[in-house]
From Swiss-Prot:
Compartments, record wording: Nucleus speckle
One of the Pfam families matching this protein, by short name: zf-CCCH_2
Function: RNA-binding protein involved in the biogenesis of circular RNAs (circRNAs), which are produced by back-splicing circularization of pre-mRNAs. Acts by binding to both exon-intron boundary and 3'-UTR of pre-mRNAs to promote circRNA biogenesis through dimerization and the association with the spliceosome. Also binds the poly(A) tail of mRNAs; controlling poly(A) length.
Biased composition, class Polar residues, residue ranges: 460-470
Family statement: Belongs to the ZC3H14 family.
Protein name in the entry: Zinc finger CCCH domain-containing protein 14
Main location: nucleus
Annotated region described as Disordered, given as residue ranges: 108-127, 457-478
Annotated GO CC locations: cytoplasm; nuclear speck; nucleus
Self-association and partners: Homodimer; facilitating circular RNAs (circRNAs) formation.
Organism, scientific name: Xenopus laevis (African clawed frog)
Zinc finger (C3H1-type): 570-595, 596-615, 616-631, 657-674, 676-694
Amino acid sequence: MTAIKGKLQELGAYVDEELPDYIMVMVANKKSQKQMTDDLSLFLGSNTTRFTTWLQGVLDKLRSVTPESNSMKTSDAIIFESSMPSLKSLSNSRDDLAKDVPTLTVSSTRHGRYDSSTSSHVQATGSSGSVARLTSAVKPLREFSPSEAVIDIKLDLDDPFNEDLSLATEIANLSRKRTALSASYRTLRPTAEVYRPPGIGQHAYHTNENNSSLHRFPQSSFVSGRSLKLQSSMTVGSSRIQDVSDLSETYKTAFRLASEKSLREEETSRKRRLPVASSVVKVKKLITDEEEVEEEGEEDEEGTDCIFRTAGISSSVSVPAKPERRPSLPPTKQANKNLILKAISEAQDCISKTTNYSTAAPQKQTVPVIPRSRLLPEEEQLMLLQNRSSLLNYPSHLQELQHQAMPEPLHKLDLLSRLQPNLEEEIELPNPVNSEEAEILRPLDSRSFILKRPKLSKEPSPQIQNNSVSPPCPAQPLPGRMIQPREAPTYEKPASPKFIVTLDGVPSPPGYISDQEVDESMCYTEQGETCVEQLGVVARPEQNYPMQLVTEPLCTNDVVMENTSSGTKEKIRERCKYWPACKNADSCAYHHPTSPCKSFPNCRFADKCFFIHPNCKYDAKCKKADCPFTHASKRFPVPPVKPVSTTSSSHPSSQPCRYFPACKKTDCSFYHPKHCRFNTQCTRPDCKFYHPAVSVPARHTLKWTRAQASD
């Protein structure tokens, strides 16, 4: 076998173990040189004749040196010995053979779907020319017991049934080769060790480097008991088979069984290629004894005939526990557990904390105005008594009021805080007593105000005197007007609480307002405090309106000014004619451009455009009336332009020009006849166009030149 492999490598035709095995099968079947040449021409090509000649010479030499003394063997027969040494004595037997004679050993084993049915190892004979013999040995993993029979198969050359037997064997081998073709290239790669629970059959493939041979024992290399018994019954010994028909039936049965076996092996190999979900696979590197563990799912009958299976129930399935999920990121990129725990603890602390907000902070609340709501009876009576007492005890001297002006805000604040039980509740308006007054005092708007809670004084308020309540405003100005004092206050404005009063007289909670907050219904005094404006109705004692202190009585010589809602006067929609030299700047009532004009120079508004045009380089000296550029300086009056007569331009004179066709005046007002396009080639006798006496040259012959500018 080694010699054949070496020769194939020399010829460059060695690919795998299939071809040497096929050649050994042909040698065993006693193929002639011509038959070998025909069969191997597909694989070897032009080297077929050279190889078959060499192989035939080797076989002839082996036949010639076969010893004649053996009576059980003929000189031209190939000897098939079935010797079964153990794995332990394998190296010793090889050493013994090497000591005796250099022999050419052919070892045949079955490989199932990985190789062909026969795996041979050929040891080349030495140059000494000593005797060599061809043997076929089946080497299992264990020794047979003495009770088991050893079958020696010897074929006679004169047997007429050798050709039929060779044909059946070749067909069976070829069918096994087809099924094993897909897996024949997986013998030399790293193997995968599949973990299974105990009880599942395992098979190992061992490589013995000392013997330079590979022994494979997959489960597919063993057939069922019926096949073994049937093939064992077809032994060809020294006794001839007499009945030809029985032998033919036996060959047909063997062929059919071989075909069925090949189909089973195909199905088994297909199932083995499917992924196994319950197996943990660990890839191992190649070692000296190559081991390949496969999951076998054969029938129970085949499992009982397998001599290499371990003890246990082959049909039991054990699924290993689900492995713990491991993170896909490397340890360096994984989150630190301490950081995660720290973040969780901080989050819990943040959630557990309660924020204490200061009660003194100003709070905003929206107070809807409810014009037709009623106060409680007790509050109604209290406010009525306060208003009556304030009217009866009005102070007569202005000096006393001025001395009491400074401490007054605190008293008013305490009074109003006591009059209003809860500032957080909505302010309610007392219902007027008479229906006529209700119709007169009906509010004109129902706006809501955003108010701020004032900081109440912590000191106990003194007893409120009668003069601490302000009287009603004696003057009732018209609605929509604002009364301003003639003189500015001589002292700094105190930080007193102020009140926002709506047009319908609804009292609002105290709050801080800025100087810019101006309401149309407010009447400002020196201290900036407000008093109620009523819509042309004289205040009566029975009406419940809160009054405030007025430090200076209103006089008739107060200036009454119109209240303007907008702070700035709207500009006139016309461009300032003095821009950009206008001295009023932003206070100018006219429009001053601020952005460049996008339609310049095609802007049709000229100097009236609301956008900036570039400056005119002539500025004040510009004489063009409709100049689109900007003129910063004042221009001199432009003399009126003499109007052009429209009759000459729109309706030219019917009198022909006497200089035609030599007239060079572009704006000539006389009649210039139109040239005929056909010129002198015109054939119409009644053509109304002009036909020059001298023919005008063609257009393509004329050359246009630029006229030289005259100095």
